[in-house]
């Protein structure tokens, strides 16, 4: 008979004689697992390496996920720790974190026996056993902390009911079963306590570079913040470097998360303030507070960024990020995103980021360059669109003028949109042909942004083109969404981290404003409703008056695909490189990259035909 823990369901408390003896020995201690898997269904042993990545799944910390990645086997090994299991648990993945149409693995009991099986949910949330069992249970055992489940899953399975594990963001889902179910098909996710967590599962397999012997550390931490009892808080804190702090290179950084707050701290960033201001007012409070000094908006140069699930970030051995010294601001802004769905009150936090730096400057300064779209309302997404694409260009003319003859090397990337962004990709093109992807996230979420190290350094030569495309979903909006700085406006940016440092800080584009006005005139001509084209009307006002029928949508989409662009090929001083940058033709691309083909694992036939029955006995808690 299956028994799950101190909160076991009543139907599961009638012990067999052996369990009754165990119960008499251990009293009311938390029940534990000694799992014996059917020998024929035992999988191969997990990799010897530990599980380097770990995140809490739920805000209470009941479920904790660890994992490692084998690129050779194209397999992820998961270790799920369940601290207070009642009658079962489900775990899985879905396109955007929804529990419907999800790829799941479920541990459940019918009150007598326990089962582990690959499953999926339909559009109504009903769970079904998958005909192809691709999650393979390797071990289940008791630990001092709770039940530990070890299982594996290939990246791709060629099962239409399974999620394809790719580079980029993965939306993990979970659910807690509080009572037995006679069958898996009796479970509907709507009746469960559920949630989601975002993470990058396929971390790059990069060797750690050698660190300098004179390396020192600096901690940029929140000053014992009383975390507000609300779901979302962005906390801003201004600090400063010591007087006379000379020029150094940051060579790595890592998160510092206050113990017990692992499920609260969602992501953190350290920004350097603009050197043009001699001082910045000290501040510690919510970033959206009316008390926040306006000057803090000039602290936007990213030094470090961390998100849940990320480990330490290392710069390449030959490069470091410069900070301190002449021409560099002493003032830093720490921003911490607290995700507190349980509205916990009274929790204090001192989380932050630890910088590792050296006075022995490396061969190259690292730099950060902005790719994508200029922050301007001329780039807009019509309402009620589910997959509208906008594209920004860093043209061959700009890279030819601004990059050194030997080019630059991109080693990391941070993608960025506002609330309607769903996909982001940057592609490098050379001689009219797309050559390689710089960074891609087909499941991008604006609520999960981190600097990601690239699996392979991308070299950009003078004359190359960098094309950044963002896909948006405005299905719940009634008006057009225009580009801009506001959270309800949109952005399309890739902050690429590269070396050696150049003067080129921003390489972005937008449609030529004059051609956009021709669009508004065309809309006037072919629609009974008039769109204001008078000079005093702003572009957002003009977009707000467009009747969004199919014709107007298609014409706008076409305009963005052929109209000339205004290029921003800017130095760090925000001044453009010398040249003519308006009315520039779109880069001509004669050959595009092929979409990757799905690989079906050869070991597919070894998977069990049905769920694994788990035989359970008692043990000491």
Placement of each model-derived feature along the sequence:
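Solvent-exposed, flexible loop/coil segments flanking beta-strands in beta-rich domains
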Residues: 55-62, 203-264, 342-420, 484-567, ...
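Noncatalytic modules at the cell exterior or secretory-pathway interfaces
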Residues: 148, 250-251, 320-339, 458-473
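Beta-sandwich interaction modules
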Residues: 300-326, 444-462
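Short acidic/polar inter-strand loop motif in beta-rich domains
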Residues: 157-159, 181, 339-343, 471-480
